[in-house]
Amino acid sequence: MKISSKKKNEPKIFVSKPLILDIKKFGHSFYRADLEFWGIDHSGPSYEGRIFINNNKANSKTRMTIKNSYVGSYFIFGHGKCFGDIGHCEIRKDRSPYDLRPSHPLTPAYTYITITDQLLKIGKNTTEFVVTIVPVLASGTLGEDEEDVIKLDKIQIITYNK
């Protein structure tokens, strides 16, 4: 994965490594396709993640149309700066499976968007899908880490058979 930024103080744009999926092999054997995002770090500012497939030139001014390979957005309500004591925002990894308390508020997030129609259209011409996420910061985020907004563990395409 590659992260780039064109202007100073503009959030870096996330560009994934290619995801390989041969849509032609599947034909119409699936009824739904989701783009999943695992391990999203939401300790920074709130933002909209605008998602484009096979358009690594997308930026915050790119129109959100299928012609521009826009497939949807996800929204992160960011935690922002921590004003707690030392260790306050550290996520404990040694929780007991019998611990009934809610997980730590900064536990990495998961989200998905359904991209069935867009995937079928884009997949007619390629087996490689590069995901570009353009972060658009919510207002009032001054003073936070505005550059390295998108941090995540994994992106994958999931299809559901009929």
Describe the residue ranges of each PLM region.
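Intrinsically disordered, flexible peripheral segments
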Residues: 1-162
